[in-house]
């Protein structure tokens, strides 16, 4: 699967510092919304109550997870995704690790290492 194929899916969970305007997770969230996607916001460290802290808190279908977080936290998210039957992830630069990639391969989770902003730009968004 390619990044362009992932971008075609409509329901996204963006995982990272989604409330901080200086972070890529925030920018990705905004661009996905501008492109007409449904976007769920996840930050495992959030204490504000403004976003979800885990994937299991989302009670709607998630097609793709955008992983924009430190790999040490990212592996926990990927393992949670597997238990919830979520099977597609876009892994942003800096969010990948051998452990994450090996786990995805082992569990048949479809993954693309790439950038959502680049993929959206290719579509003119």
Annotate each PLM feature:
Residues 1-45, 50:
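Hydrophobic, well-ordered beta-alpha structural blocks that scaffold small-molecule cofactor pockets
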Residues 55-95:
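Mid-chain, well-packed structural core segment of small domains
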Residues 27-28, 76-81, 100-103:
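A short acidic, amphipathic alpha-helical/loop segment
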Residues 35-38, 45-70, 111:
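Mobile, glycine- and charge-enriched loop segments
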Residues 1-2, 50, 54, 73-77, ...:
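Short acidic active-site motifs
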Residues 37, 84-89, 107-109:
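A short helix->loop->beta-strand "cap" motif at the edges of active sites that frequently abuts
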Residues 93-120:
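Rossmann-fold NAD(P)-binding glycine/threonine-rich loop
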Residues 2-3, 116-125:
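C-terminal helix-to-coil terminal segments
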